[in-house]
Amino acid sequence: MPKKAVRPMPYAVSEHTKAMLCQALKKKMAQKSLDKITIRELADDCGLKRQAFYYHFQDIYDLVRWMFQQEAVSLLRQHDGALLWQEGLLQLLRYIEENRAVCRCALQSLGRSYISMFFRDDIHAIIHRTVDELHRQVHFLQAPGQGELLTQFYVIALAGVVESWVLEELKCSAEELVDFIDQLLTDQLRGAIDRQKEESLRLNRPQGGLAT
């Protein structure tokens, strides 16, 4: 006798179940390291069978990935205009501030490279748009690939600053950190623009006086 096909779970029910597992995970991450959390205890906390977890996620790391994509990365994507990157970053930092124990647990359990992969593409896109927009206005980039080099520099620097802030090595508010990053980025790009202007003036300056 042929086996009955497994009926797909309704979307709303599936999303509700994933949200329940996410909240259970956040509760546990505030108490202990990720490697001490089991799928069984997450399922038990949600009143689910262990198999229900595997219907939605491959493992706990897959649940962590979904959690950050749903709750944190989406904040950046809501503010992806070139003029709104500061607001997107501020919303992300406020999320981290509200979930600092969870983010610290993820950072310490998984490492910077694993966590940054969730945000790298979005932060890269935000900074790259800012650099491109300034270049369109004043043409300060002097060589092919210079914009990407500058973008990568700021992405790596920003990741390090945010990591230190998550670990509370930096004592400042989310607003103060965004203001600092904004000012640093603005000053550095303004310096590049000023150098480009000086170079243009030097190249266009007449060499010597007119012969008599």
Specify the residue positions occupied by each region the protein language model found.
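Alpha-helical bundle regulatory/interaction domains
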Residues: M1-K32, K36-T212
